[in-house]
């Protein structure tokens, strides 16, 4: 897949990077978002996500990041910290099977846009991604 920010000359609603160690979750998110018109890239963990992003020619090739918290290798907290430092204008939405209110509040205070517990509600996911895309659009200038 070729990455690059969407413009009025490129098709689709935007590009989403899904970072989750559970293949079934990545598939569910990919299918839901693809049907809604988004381009989706997947990573199994934070380490792979960092590699994907750093390998791209354009450092702002992704519009929204959906990231699990508990993953092997580089976990979600570490990945989120990396994303926020390197790409502060890219909205991050946390997805996790361990809903912890205190953790969610702390992540929101640290600049994460939203928090979606698993199992993921497809309609809620689309609503949150749409809001994140709108936020991303306002941050692009």
Q: Can you name each region flagged by the protein language model?
A:
Residues 1-17, 58, 123-126, 130-141:
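Non-catalytic signal-transmission and effector/linker regions of two-component phosphorelay proteins
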Residues 27-35:
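Charged docking surfaces used in two-component/phosphorelay signaling
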Residues 44-48, 75-78:
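Acidic catalytic/metal-coordinating carboxylates
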Residues 51, 77-89, 106:
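Short amphipathic alpha-helix used as the core "switch/output" element in two-component signaling
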Residues 57-66:
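Active-site beta3 strand of CheY-like receiver
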Residues 71:
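Receiver (REC) domain active-site loop signature in two-component systems and cognate sites
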